[in-house]
Amino acid sequence: LRSRGLGDVYKRQQVADIKIESNIFVPKYMNIDYGDMGVLFGNLLDNAIEANQGVDRKKRWINVSVKYEEHILIINIKNSKIRGSRRKKKGYLNHGIGLNSVKQIVEKFNGIVEVQDFGEMYEVSAILYGICDDKDLGKSVL
């Protein structure tokens, strides 16, 4: 279970020389715990950075898209990877717990997580339902 700050993820991305593009359109306030958001994005971005490790430095990239539409939060992260690779962390007893943590958080909002391997690209999509924005906080939206 990773709950490191996104600043740590940013530092890892810089050291790994990965180009990141992001399109993030969300309200300032939402009914998602900050700790859950840290675990959600920390794990997804850590996985994307890890998948880039074997890729030629000039071909490393991550694309992050997050948008909010009518009580739905849509997260999409795509990243480069080596075709056919399925990295395993040597000596890491809890490998795989990160994505399970992501799924648990998404399930709190009756959402879904989908992971797809397109050869030289991974894509992870998560949809969370019943998200309140700053105009709706305190109201039931389900």
Which residues does each PLM region occupy?
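Heptad-repeat coiled-coil segments of the DHp/HisKA dimerization-phosphoacceptor module
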Residues: S22-K28, Y68-E70, N79-K81, D117
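Conserved ATP-binding N-box helix of the HATPase_c
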Residues: Y34-R57
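Short beta-strand/loop element within the Bergerat-fold HATPase_c
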Residues: K59-H71
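Conserved short strand/loop->alpha-helix "switch" segment adjacent to the catalytic nucleotide/phosphoryl-transfer site
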Residues: E21-L40
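Glycine-rich/acidic phosphate-handling loop/turn and adjacent ATP-lid/helix
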Residues: H71-N100, K135-V141
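Flexible, glycine-/charge-rich segments associated with ATP-binding catalytic modules
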Residues: Q104-L142
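Short conserved segments within the C-terminal catalytic ATPase subdomain
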Residues: Q13-E21
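Single conserved hydrophobic/aromatic residue that forms the stacking wall/gate
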Residues: L1-Y10
